[in-house]
Amino acid sequence: VSLYNQTNEIPIKPTPVIGMVGSNQDLKKINSNKFCNIGNKILVLGKQLEKNLSPYLLQDQNLASNINEYNDLEELDLDYEKKVADCVLKMSDFKYIMSCNDISRGGVFLSLLKMQYKDMGFKVNIPDPIDLFCEYSAGYVIEIRNEDLNNVSSFLSKNGVGYFEIGEIIKENIEINSKKFDYFDIINNYHNNFEKIIN
């Protein structure tokens, strides 16, 4: 934590960094963080997607003046976080989950980009595409086989964990609400736009 722990006369709340390691006795139970098969379904576990769960959008729209104000808006529910994480682990044991990525940093959209692999892209339908940028620590993007949807739905409902289906894995393309995007254009903008703006 910086000794000068404030900016613009507003204090910056300290953020402890915790490093963790774990052990796994069965290599077959380790899930991929990359898409596995074209045609599989994509689900989001956790709360419903909402704009106010994106700190960057709130700042961009002047709804929150800084990250500190956003942090005050989002109240942690550690019990729910553990419940969702436990469900992910159990579904992994049941071999329902083919791949998985959390949405705690960068939201659903960044998780989907990270999960792209080889010639596999994704097609999703979201009522408001801005919701793709919402992020929270108790949320996960998971890939499941079509035939496992009923079992996954029953398991999550029984354990009180929300979920919703957002799309499927397709060949190469990125489609959001039927609009196509180029993966390499997105990555190029992500890495280079800031430099263009400040020059």
Which residues are covered by each model-predicted region?
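Glycine-rich anion-binding loops of enzyme active sites
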Residues: 1-54, 165-168
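Glycine-/charge-enriched secondary-structure boundary and capping motifs
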Residues: 1-17, 70-72, 85-199
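Glycine-/acidic-rich phosphate or pyrophosphate-binding loops and their flanking alpha/beta elements
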Residues: 26-38, 58-62, 83-91, 125-130
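Glycine- and other small-residue-rich loops at beta-strand/loop junctions that grip anionic moieties
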Residues: 34, 77, 101
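Gly-rich Lys/Arg/Thr-decorated short loops/hinges at beta-loop-alpha junctions or inter-strand turns
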Residues: 50-75
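C-terminal transmembrane module of polytopic alpha-helical membrane proteins
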Residues: 76-83
